[in-house]
């Protein structure tokens, strides 16, 4: 009986150890890049939140105003999490929360059919982008066997150049969809005008910038620039996006 008890105890310890190994070893990553984006998030979100007090008052019942504020708080915190976590799985959770909450804020005024249509287009496009990100992250995981940023960065040196090119394209499409880079911008001119003014300002001023953070973090910090055509392609897409933005 004692032997079986000991075996059971050690099996239990082994199971607990395996479960602990699955947990992120580095939950947060605070460096100049993340701190800069955190500063931008809170500097822009705070006045927008204050503005919403007067904007929503008189337009909606108190219960709906309270719901709006709860969604807004979750929205801001999820954006802060996106730029400060150090693990891909936690990053994806924060990214998904940010996307879903921003969708509910876009369709906040359910009496307008255009809001529903804009929100539907937005949520479809954002999940297409997320699918590309998941594919890129899984390719990185094949080499790192870990979802922690620093481990992925160290393992990225062993990734073949051709594979790095594929991962770069997946990341560019995934984050480019959220950033509104042409031609992945089709959701942006519909969703932003339909969202309440304070939400539109946060989405355009902060949320789409989290995608820029993602490109910098995963392409430059983790993957490592592999070829000059990466920078050239980003520059060309940025110039085209600027031109289309001016025309709009």
Where are these regions (language model features)?
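Transmembrane helix-loop-helix hairpins at membrane boundaries of multipass inner-membrane proteins
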Residues: 1-70, 145-156
């Amino acid at each position: 009986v004692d032997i079986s008890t000991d075996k059971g105890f050690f099996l239990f310890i082994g199971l607990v150890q395996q479960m602990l190994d699955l947990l992120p070893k580095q939950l947060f990553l605070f460096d100049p890049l993340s701190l800069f984006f955190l500063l931008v998030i809170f500097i822009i979100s705070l006045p927008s939140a204050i503005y919403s007090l007067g904007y929503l008052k008189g337009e909606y019942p108190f219960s709906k105003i309270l719901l709006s504020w709860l969604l807004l708080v979750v929205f801001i915190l999820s954006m802060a999490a996106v730029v400060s976590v150090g693990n891909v799985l936690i990053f994806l959770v924060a990214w998904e929360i940010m996307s879903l909450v921003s969708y509910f804020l876009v369709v906040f005024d359910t009496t307008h059919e255009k809001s529903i249509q804009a929100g539907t287009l937005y949520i479809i496009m954002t999940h297409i982008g997320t699918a590309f990100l998941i594919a890129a992250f899984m390719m990185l995981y094949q080499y790192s066997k870990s979802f922690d940023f620093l481990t992925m960065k160290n393992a990225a040196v062993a990734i073949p150049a051709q594979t790095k090119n594929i991962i770069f394209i997946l990341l560019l499409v995934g984050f480019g969809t959220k950033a509104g880079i042409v031609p992945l911008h089709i959701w942006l001119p519909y969703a932003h005008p339909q969202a309440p003014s304070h939400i539109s300002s946060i989405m355009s001023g902060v949320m789409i910038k989290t995608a820029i953070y993602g490109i910098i973090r995963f392409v430059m910090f983790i993957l490592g620039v592999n070829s000059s055509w990466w920078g050239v392609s980003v520059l060309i897409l940025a110039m085209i996006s600027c031109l289309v933005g001016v025309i709009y």
